[in-house]
Amino acid sequence: SQHGSPEGLFVALTGLWIRRRNFFLGRWIRHGGYWPDPKLRLFRKDAAKFEDRAVHEDAKLLSGNAGELKNALVHHSYPTLSDYIDHINRYSSLGAEMVGAKGRGFSVLNIVVRPLATFVYNYFLRLGFLDGREGLLLHLYHAVYVSWKYAKAWELGRGKQAGGRTT
Protein backbone atom coordinates (compact mmCIF):
# COMPACT_ATOMS: atom_id res chain seq x y z
CA SER A 1 0.00 0.00 0.00
CA GLN A 2 1.15 3.53 -0.60
CA HIS A 3 0.71 4.21 3.11
CA GLY A 4 2.91 1.28 4.18
CA SER A 5 0.40 -0.52 6.41
CA PRO A 6 -3.32 -0.88 7.04
CA GLU A 7 -2.89 1.44 10.02
CA GLY A 8 -1.27 4.03 7.75
CA LEU A 9 -4.16 3.75 5.32
CA PHE A 10 -6.67 4.33 8.11
CA VAL A 11 -4.79 7.43 9.29
CA ALA A 12 -4.99 8.82 5.74
CA LEU A 13 -8.78 8.40 5.63
CA THR A 14 -11.20 10.76 7.30
CA GLY A 15 -14.22 8.49 7.02
CA LEU A 16 -15.50 5.03 6.18
CA TRP A 17 -18.54 4.01 4.18
CA ILE A 18 -20.50 1.05 5.49
CA ARG A 19 -22.81 -0.94 3.25
CA ARG A 20 -26.00 -2.02 5.01
CA ARG A 21 -27.54 -5.42 4.43
CA ASN A 22 -31.14 -4.50 5.27
CA PHE A 23 -33.56 -7.16 6.49
CA PHE A 24 -37.34 -6.80 6.43
CA LEU A 25 -39.50 -9.44 8.13
CA GLY A 26 -36.40 -11.63 8.33
CA ARG A 27 -35.53 -11.45 4.62
CA TRP A 28 -32.48 -9.73 3.17
CA ILE A 29 -33.83 -7.07 0.81
CA ARG A 30 -31.47 -6.96 -2.17
CA HIS A 31 -33.47 -4.84 -4.59
CA GLY A 32 -35.60 -1.72 -4.78
CA GLY A 33 -32.76 0.51 -3.59
CA TYR A 34 -32.11 -1.33 -0.31
CA TRP A 35 -28.75 -2.85 -1.27
CA PRO A 36 -25.94 -1.92 -0.99
CA ASP A 37 -27.36 1.14 0.88
CA PRO A 38 -23.98 2.77 1.70
CA LYS A 39 -23.85 5.06 4.73
CA LEU A 40 -20.98 7.25 5.91
CA ARG A 41 -21.01 6.30 9.58
CA LEU A 42 -17.42 6.22 10.82
CA PHE A 43 -15.64 9.53 10.43
CA ARG A 44 -13.45 12.02 12.20
CA LYS A 45 -15.63 14.54 13.96
CA ASP A 46 -13.93 17.48 12.23
CA ALA A 47 -14.17 15.91 8.75
CA ALA A 48 -17.91 15.29 8.43
CA LYS A 49 -21.26 16.38 9.77
CA PHE A 50 -24.83 15.17 9.74
CA GLU A 51 -27.19 17.11 7.52
CA ASP A 52 -29.83 19.00 9.47
CA ARG A 53 -32.89 16.93 8.50
CA ALA A 54 -35.45 15.26 10.71
CA VAL A 55 -35.86 12.29 8.34
CA HIS A 56 -33.29 10.25 6.40
CA GLU A 57 -30.36 12.06 7.96
CA ASP A 58 -27.00 11.34 6.36
CA ALA A 59 -23.46 12.33 7.17
CA LYS A 60 -21.63 14.43 4.61
CA LEU A 61 -17.84 14.33 4.29
CA LEU A 62 -16.45 17.88 4.49
CA SER A 63 -12.77 17.11 3.96
CA GLY A 64 -10.43 14.27 3.17
CA ASN A 65 -11.19 10.90 1.66
CA ALA A 66 -13.40 8.04 2.74
CA GLY A 67 -12.75 4.36 2.32
CA GLU A 68 -15.23 1.51 2.37
CA LEU A 69 -15.46 -1.32 4.87
CA LYS A 70 -15.13 -4.71 3.22
CA ASN A 71 -18.01 -6.34 5.08
CA ALA A 72 -21.57 -5.07 5.31
CA LEU A 73 -23.47 -4.15 8.44
CA VAL A 74 -26.37 -6.54 9.00
CA HIS A 75 -29.35 -4.29 9.69
CA HIS A 76 -32.45 -6.02 11.08
CA SER A 77 -34.50 -2.86 10.98
CA TYR A 78 -38.08 -4.17 10.91
CA PRO A 79 -38.59 -7.70 12.21
CA THR A 80 -42.40 -7.31 12.26
CA LEU A 81 -45.03 -5.41 10.31
CA SER A 82 -45.98 -3.61 13.51
CA ASP A 83 -42.40 -2.31 13.80
CA TYR A 84 -42.51 -1.00 10.23
CA ILE A 85 -45.96 0.56 10.62
CA ASP A 86 -44.78 2.32 13.81
CA HIS A 87 -41.72 3.53 11.88
CA ILE A 88 -43.70 4.93 8.94
CA ASN A 89 -46.14 6.59 11.31
CA ARG A 90 -43.26 8.35 13.15
CA TYR A 91 -41.31 9.22 10.02
CA SER A 92 -44.37 10.44 8.10
CA SER A 93 -45.06 12.87 10.96
CA LEU A 94 -41.47 14.15 10.83
CA GLY A 95 -41.55 14.27 7.02
CA ALA A 96 -44.84 16.18 7.16
CA GLU A 97 -43.12 18.96 9.07
CA MET A 98 -40.42 19.11 6.40
CA VAL A 99 -42.77 19.21 3.40
CA GLY A 100 -45.18 21.52 5.24
CA ALA A 101 -42.34 23.99 5.77
CA LYS A 102 -41.91 23.98 1.98
CA GLY A 103 -45.60 24.78 1.50
CA ARG A 104 -46.50 21.36 0.15
CA GLY A 105 -49.46 19.33 1.27
CA PHE A 106 -52.71 17.93 0.00
CA SER A 107 -53.01 17.54 -3.75
CA VAL A 108 -53.85 14.61 -5.99
CA LEU A 109 -50.23 14.67 -7.13
CA ASN A 110 -48.84 14.39 -3.59
CA ILE A 111 -51.45 12.07 -2.07
CA VAL A 112 -51.96 9.66 -4.99
CA VAL A 113 -49.48 10.12 -7.84
CA ARG A 114 -46.24 10.43 -5.81
CA PRO A 115 -46.94 7.28 -3.75
CA LEU A 116 -47.92 5.34 -6.88
CA ALA A 117 -44.82 6.55 -8.74
CA THR A 118 -42.67 5.63 -5.71
CA PHE A 119 -44.11 2.10 -5.70
CA VAL A 120 -43.73 1.60 -9.47
CA TYR A 121 -40.16 2.93 -9.41
CA ASN A 122 -38.94 0.84 -6.47
CA TYR A 123 -40.98 -2.33 -7.00
CA PHE A 124 -40.81 -2.65 -10.79
CA LEU A 125 -37.97 -0.51 -12.16
CA ARG A 126 -35.56 -1.19 -9.29
CA LEU A 127 -36.62 -4.87 -9.22
CA GLY A 128 -38.15 -4.90 -5.73
CA PHE A 129 -40.45 -7.71 -6.88
CA LEU A 130 -37.43 -10.04 -6.79
CA ASP A 131 -37.57 -9.85 -2.98
CA GLY A 132 -40.81 -11.84 -2.86
CA ARG A 133 -43.72 -11.10 -0.56
CA GLU A 134 -41.46 -9.14 1.77
CA GLY A 135 -40.44 -6.89 -1.12
CA LEU A 136 -44.07 -6.34 -2.06
CA LEU A 137 -45.04 -5.38 1.49
CA LEU A 138 -41.99 -3.16 2.00
CA HIS A 139 -42.51 -1.16 -1.19
CA LEU A 140 -46.29 -1.01 -0.80
CA TYR A 141 -46.00 0.37 2.73
CA HIS A 142 -43.22 2.73 1.71
CA ALA A 143 -45.68 4.19 -0.82
CA VAL A 144 -48.22 4.50 2.03
CA TYR A 145 -45.57 6.44 3.98
CA VAL A 146 -45.28 8.92 1.10
CA SER A 147 -49.05 9.43 1.04
CA TRP A 148 -49.26 9.81 4.83
CA LYS A 149 -46.43 12.35 4.82
CA TYR A 150 -48.32 14.71 2.50
CA ALA A 151 -51.68 14.09 4.20
CA LYS A 152 -50.14 14.91 7.57
CA ALA A 153 -48.53 18.06 6.11
CA TRP A 154 -51.98 19.13 4.96
CA GLU A 155 -53.38 18.35 8.40
CA LEU A 156 -50.66 20.45 10.07
CA GLY A 157 -51.29 23.37 7.72
CA ARG A 158 -55.03 23.12 8.27
CA GLY A 159 -54.55 23.27 12.03
CA LYS A 160 -52.30 26.33 11.76
CA GLN A 161 -54.82 28.14 9.54
CA ALA A 162 -57.62 27.44 12.00
CA GLY A 163 -55.41 28.26 14.96
CA GLY A 164 -56.27 24.86 16.36
CA ARG A 165 -54.44 21.78 17.43
CA THR A 166 -53.72 18.96 15.02
CA THR A 167 -52.76 16.23 17.46
Q: Which stretches of residues belong to each language-model region?
A:
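Catalytic-site signature of metal-activated, phosphate-bearing donor transferases
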Residues: S1-G4, G8-K160
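Short polybasic linear motifs
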Residues: Q161-T167
